[in-house]
Amino acid sequence: MDLKLLDILACPICKGPLQLSEDKTELISKGAGVAYPIRDGIPVMLESEARTLTTDERLDK
């Protein structure tokens, strides 16, 4: 995934910023408490495809 894209993408649920996961497989929205998968280098930013963050993930800075 192109890291420049992170500067312009926003969470479709809360409109907040997104963070790339450490393993680079998800875009994380702390504001909405969800993670969107990245498939073949393309973020899938559909609410139906997002997974809910665990409590530990929400608290992780």
From Swiss-Prot:
Q: Which InterPro entries match?
A: Trm112-like (IPR005651)
- Specify one Pfam family: Trm112p
Q: May I have one GO cellular component term? A: cytosol
Signal sequence annotation: none
The record's family statement is: Belongs to the UPF0434 family.
The protein depicted here goes by the name UPF0434 protein Pmen_1615
Species annotation: Ectopseudomonas mendocina (strain ymp)
